[in-house]
UniProtKB/Swiss-Prot annotation:
It comes from Saccharomyces cerevisiae (strain ATCC 204508 / S288c). L-glutamine binds at residues 49-53, 74-76, 97. The modification Phosphoserine is found at residues 265, 509. One of its GO terms (molecular function) is ATP binding. Transmembrane segments: none annotated. The active site is at 2 (for gatase activity). This is Asparagine synthetase [glutamine-hydrolyzing] 1. GO terms for biological process: asparagine biosynthetic process; L-asparagine biosynthetic process. The gene is ASN1. The keyword Phosphoprotein applies. CDD domains: Asn_synthase_B_C, AsnB. Keywords: Amino-acid biosynthesis, Asparagine biosynthesis, ATP-binding, Glutamine amidotransferase, Ligase, Nucleotide-binding, Phosphoprotein.
Length: 572
C-alpha cells in the first residue's frame, strides 16, 4: 500500500511539477520508504512508497521498457505470479506485484481490473493514445479520489487522499469501488458485476460450512504475501480472532516450507502463492498480534486469551481517555470524515498503528467486512425478514468504502502501516453473499446468535482429529463494536467532552451550509466543526457518509452496539 497522486493533461506540467511534489508530500505518511515521480507528455505521476513486495526493485512509477506506459499503484495484487505467467512475452523490469497491470492492460484494455485479485487503486498512462485509465478494487479497500477544476476543465486529478486535491479542485469525488475510468470516453464504468450486487435478488444457496472455512483460510494465505515483518490486529472478538488463528497456522506452515533465515534478499524471489495456493514466503517465523484498549477493557482480556491459545507473540497497548481526545484532530485530518462511528473506532486503531510501526512492522491483517457479510451488527437482530436482512447486508457491503474500509485504510496508513482484510476476498464474498439469508438470520429461540454460520464453520466439535481454531468462549463471544470493546468509558468520555464543548446555543445554530445534513448529537456537531476547520470546501464534505443503523427497524440512532436493545439480552 502506498500513496499516489496524478494530474492528467495539465496545461503546463513541467511548471506544475514542484507543486505536484508538494501536494504528494501531504500523503507521504502512506509511503515513507521512497518518493518517485515521472512525467510523460502533459501527465505527471507521483508515488509515495511503502515497500512490502518487490522491496529491492519495485519503486514506482513503473514504466514499460519502451517508455510508452506509465503506472502508479496503491495496493497489492495477490495473483501477480499467475498474471506474470499469462503475460510471459512481456518484458518485466521489477519483482513488483503491481507491474503485471501494464501487460494486462495491453491484453485486455479497460477490462484489465477484472483479472486482478487484490486491493488496489491505480492510474495508468498510455502515451501512444494520450490516455489515462484509473481503477479501484471491487469493494474499495484502497482509497482513491478524483478531482476536477473549473479553471482547467481538461485536467483530471487522482489521489489516494483528498487532501492532495483541495488546492486545485473545486469538484472532488470518492472514486467508486469496482469501477474504471477511461479518458478516451471520459466515463467511469463498472467492471465488477457479481450476481450478489443486485440487492433485489435474494439468494438460495444452501450452507456449506467447510467451503466457508477453506475459502477464508485461502483468503488469509493470500494476504501473507510479504517480504517484511507482519502481524494481526487482535481485538479478541470473533472476526479478528479467526483471522489471527488462521494466520498463525499459515505462518507456521510457510516457515516450515521456506526458512526466512536462509532467504537471500538479493536473489530474484516472487512473494505470494502459486497455482496450488501454497505460500512461498514468510515475513516472520512467528505471528505477532497487537491489541489496544483502555485499562481492563473487554477487548484486551479476550485478546490475551486468544493470543495464548494460538501461540502468537502478543503486544498489548493501553491508552488513556485524554490521549484519545488529544488525537481527535489528527484522526479527523487523516480520515477525512466527520462520521461518528468511524471516528470513535478509528482513534484506538490510529494510536495502535503508531505503536505497531514503531516495532518495525509494516503490514497487519484485520477483520473488517465480516459484520456486513454475515449481518453481524446487533441491529440485524431486528430484521423483519430474510429478504430485508439480505438487502441491508448488500447495501452495507457496497458502502464499506465509506465506512470500515476507509477506517482500516487511513487510520493505519497514517503511520505507514498496511492493513489487509481477508473477509473481503473476492472469492470469499462470492461464496458467502450467495448463501440463503435465512441461514444468517439471528434467531435467539434456536440458539443462533449473530454470525452463527461463521462461528459454526470454525467449530471443530465432532472433528476428533482437528485442532480447535479458538477457545469456545471466544468462538461464541457476543459481538462488541470495536469502539465499545476498547472500553465503554471511551464512548462515554467522548460524549461527556462534547457536552462540555458544545453549548446548547451552538447546537441550536447549525451552519447554513450544512443544509439538511445537520448533526443530531453534540458529539456529531463537535466532529463536524473539527472537520470543517480542516476541510472547509463543501465538495469535501459531500464525500462523507454517516454510518447509522436502520431506524425503520426500531434501532437507536447511536451506532454503538451497546445502545442496541439486543445487547441487553445476552443470547446463549
Amino acid at each position: 500500500m502506498c500513496g499516489i497522486f496524478a494530474a492528467f493533461r495539465h496545461e503546463d506540467v513541467h511548471r506544475y511539477k514542484p507543486k505536484a511534489l508538494q501536494l504528494s508530500k501531504r500523503i507521504r505518511h502512506r509511503g515513507p520508504d521512497w518518493s518517485g515521480n515521472a512525467i510523460k507528455n502533459s501527465t505527471i505521476f507521483v508515488h509515495e512508497r511503502l515497500a512490502i513486495v518487490g522491496v529491492e526493485s519495485g519503486a514506482q512509477p513503473i514504466t514499460s521498457s519502451d517508455g510508452e506506459y506509465m503506472l502508479c499503484v496503491n495496493g497489492e495484487i495477490y495473483n501477480h505470479i499467475q498474471l506474470r505467467e499469462e503475460c510471459a512475452d512481456y518484458e518485466f523490469g521489477t519483482l513488483s506485484d503491481c507491474e503485471p497491470i501494464i501487460p494486462m492492460y495491453l491484453k485486455h484494455d479497460i477490462d484489465a481490473p477484472k483479472y486482478l485479485d487484490g486491493m488496489f487503486a491505480w492510474t495508468l498512462y498510455d502515451a501512444k493514445q494520450d490516455r489515462i485509465v484509473a481503477a479501484r478494487d471491487p469493494i474499495g479497500i484502497t482509497t482513491l479520489y478524483m478531482g476536477r477544476s473549473s479553471a482547467s476543465p481538461k485536467t483530471v486529478y487522482f489521489a489516494s487522499e483528498l487532501k492532495c486535491l483541495t488546492d486545485d479542485c473545486d469538484t472532488i469525488t470518492a472514486f467508486p469501488p469496482g469501477h474504471v475510468y477511461d479518458s478516451k470516453t471520459d466515463k467511469i464504468t463498472r467492471y465488477f458485476t457479481p450476481d450478489w450486487l443486485d440487492e433485489k435478488r435474494i439468494p438460495s444457496t444452501p450452507i456449506d460450512y467447510m467451503a466457508i472455512r477453506h475459502s477464508l483460510e485461502k483468503a488469509v494465505r493470500k494476504r501473507l504475501m510479504a517480504e517484511v515483518p507482519y502481524g494481526v490486529l487482535l481485538s479478541g472478538g470473533l472476526d479478528s480472532s479467526l483471522i489471527a488463528s488462521i494466520a498463525a497456522r499459515e505462518t507456521a506452515k510457510a516457515t516450515n516450507d521456506v526458512e526466512p533465515s536462509t532467504y537471500d534478499s538479493k536473489a530474484r524471489h516472487l512473494a505470494g502463492i502459486d497455482d496450488d495456493g501454497k505460500l512461498h514466503t514468510a515475513g516472520w517465523t512467528s505471528l505477532h498480534s497487537f491489541a489496544i484498549g483502555l485499562p481492563n477493557a473487554p477487548d484486551l482480556q479476550a485478546a490475551r486469551k486468544v493470543a495464548k491459545f494460538i501461540g502468537s507473540i502478543h503486544h498489548e497497548h493501553t491508552f488513556t481517555l485524554q490521549e484519545g481526545l488529544d488525537a481527535l484532530d489528527d484522526v479527523i485530518y487523516h480520515l477525512e470524515t466527520y462520521d461518528v462511528t468511524t471516528i470513535r473506532a478509528s482513534t484506538p486503531m490510529f494510536l495502535l498503528s503508531r505503536k505497531i510501526k514503531a516495532q518495525g512492522v509494516k503490514m497487519v491483517l484485520s477483520g473488517e467486512g465480516s459484520d456486513e457479510i454475515f449481518g453481524g451488527y446487533l441491529y440485524f437482530a431486528q430484521a423483519p425478514s430474510a429478504a430485508e436482512f439480505h438487502t441491508e447486508s448488500v447495501q452495507r457491503v457496497k458502502n464499506l468504502h465509506l465506512a470500515d474500509c476507509l477506517r482500516a485504510n487511513k487510520s493505519t496508513m497514517a503511520w505507514g502501516l498496511e492493513a489487509r482484510v481477508p473477509f473481503l476476498d473476492r472469492e470469499f464474498l462470492q461464496l458467502c453473499m450467495n448463501i440463503d439469508p435465512n441461514e444468517k438470520m439471528i434467531k435467539p429461540k434456536e440458539g443462533r446468535i449473530e454470525k452463527y454460520i461463521l462461528r459454526k464453520a470454525f467449530d471443530t466439535t465432532g472433528e476428533p482429529d482437528a485442532k480447535p481454531y479458538l477457545p469456545e468462549e471466544i468462538l461464541w463471544r457476543q459481538k462488541e463494536q470495536f469502539s465499545d470493546g476498547v472500553g465503554y468509558s471511551w464512548i462515554d468520555g467522548l460524549k461527556d467532552t462534547a457536552e462540555a464543548v458544545i453549548s446548547d446555543e451552538m447546537f441550536a445554530s447549525p451552519k447554513a451550509e450544512w443544509g439538511s445534513d445537520i448533526p443530531t448529537t453534540k458529539e456529531a456537531f463537535w466532529y463536524r466543526l473539527k472537520f470543517d476547520a480542516l476541510f472547509p470546501q463543501k465538495t469535501v464534505a459531500d464525500t462523507v457518509m454517516r454510518w447509522i443503523p436502520k431506524a425503520d427497524w426500531g434501532c437507536a440512532e447511536d451506532p454503538s452496539g451497546r445502545y442496541a436493545q439486543i445487547h441487553e439480552k445476552h443470547i446463549e
